[in-house]
């Protein structure tokens, strides 16, 4: 259908609506939203502004635009023709103003200058070219009033003027200008699709009322109302922040390989071919191989002299050694640097240590436990005082003498596999490695070597996965039972046994404590104040398995504080996620969480749990009225920064509450005016039917 036919259709009012305003206030996008039903994402709205004008010939070219121009307002059929204009002040717009029925004057609520130009430039121009045409004042880009301006400014073009919080105009500013000029006032947001119909429907009403004054004989215009009030826009609740878990750190594979090369805290010494010495750690070997697990467990259950287990002796030796290495309290009070023990003192100390533990003195032959009948790969095992090659400290070690058939090179490769769970496909001596794996009954390694030799290395992935699962389960078992432990943490409400090698490879804080020159590195008991057993158990579970195993009695804030103290950001994030899940579950079941969230807020901020703090801020702000009514004192006791955040991000916002009050007040006033007007019309209608007494 041709656009000109709308002018010929009976009882169809064609309305020419001219849209004017400064550049970049959103005129063209407002027109496209009405004429083309265009929806835009925030990214498109924030793209670089290019001055454009929506062509009026779209009504002739595009059938869809023509169909959308037709509407019914107050039982009057209309065809709305929108005219876009340039925002440059020096442009000549007299042709656009010609024969206009209504003018929509736009400004941006994020640009105070555009509102100033309404009074200084645009309104005088409109009254100059079309003095009798009704005008509608429209505040565009309403969504910027509640948007995250920092994110908005980051998304805009680099050289764009940043939008400041002080640039955002409250609704009363636009309403004051509209009242001063005697204009109806509306606000719109193309992003939220709010106010578009309000603006153009009421622009049509204003045009039809003006036309009714001139064409009073048109009866279908009698029902047209004056421009209606616009209900205020309630911004949507911001979605709760999602707790993001950073990439999980590796299971200490590289650190374990490094620990094998630099055997700090080593407690096992392998002697190969009577000359090659290789230091290792029981916990890594026992959790990776059932053969070594049985070997070291047998050592703990049986001692050479039949009195007490070797595992208990090792703890005593480390305590005694720690007392030797610690500085004497009397010497600490003396000025000057601490004295280093002389050679004769070391000799005396080591002798005392040996005697205290019942171990063989230097030069004596230690009692060896024969292993040839137990396994053909081993000769014997005994306890002996040895000097650690890294820390240069003497301590008890399990000395294992291997069979002559065990070659040093393949045996080192086997140990590296037990530490890391990885096998290099380019290993040179695969045959020797396979032989040692067969002798030591490590069948998974034997199978992996066979796959590599058969060019089927891809099959090793499943074997490696099963290896790590078995190792993780064995580590959990050793942690829960304290098997092969070499350190005990003394806590406020108990003690927990742990393993220094695993801690060194899993936590830099622990590595610094046990691997440095601190006195804890030589002690088997470490006192950690202000820590409870449940939280420490959760931390150790995480360090051993890289997973959080929450307990019903676990306090998330205590765990976060401990994880932050140990410099474990991944565990902090897991604890934050657990805390949010527990709070959400409680809220879903109808339990009030407002007080708990308030108590979490500043503790989370203090312990660097920024994601949990952001979630708490969001909950408080989106439920501000209910939280404030129940916990007013707690709200007021928060820091100034938090209170400022509450005021800025509370929902519903203050400006909405003010607008809602104004809307309800004006609505009541209009209803009273309409009632009074209807009474007046009713009296005028019936006054002609009253009979006069004189006539009667």
Swiss-Prot record:
Top-level division of the source organism's lineage: Eukaryota
Protein name as annotated: Rho-related BTB domain-containing protein 1
Record bears the keyword rRNA-binding: no
Keywords: GTP-binding, Nucleotide-binding, Repeat
CDD domains from the UniProt entry: BACK_RHOBTB1, BTB1_POZ_RHOBTB1, BTB2_POZ_RHOBTB1, RhoBTB
Annotated PANTHER family: RHO FAMILY GTPASE
Domain BTB: 266-427, 485-552
UniProt-listed Gene3D superfamilies: P-loop containing nucleotide triphosphate hydrolases, Potassium Channel Kv1.1, Chain A
Species whose genome carries this gene: Homo sapiens
Gene behind this protein: RHOBTB1
Span list, region Rho-like: 1-210
Residues at which GTP binds: 21-28, 84-88, 140-143
InterPro entries recorded: BTB/POZ_dom, P-loop_NTPase, SKP1/BTB/POZ_sf, Small_GTPase, Small_GTPase_Rho
GO-annotated biological processes: actin filament organization; cortical cytoskeleton organization; establishment or maintenance of cell polarity; regulation of actin cytoskeleton organization; regulation of cell shape; signal transduction; small GTPase-mediated signal transduction
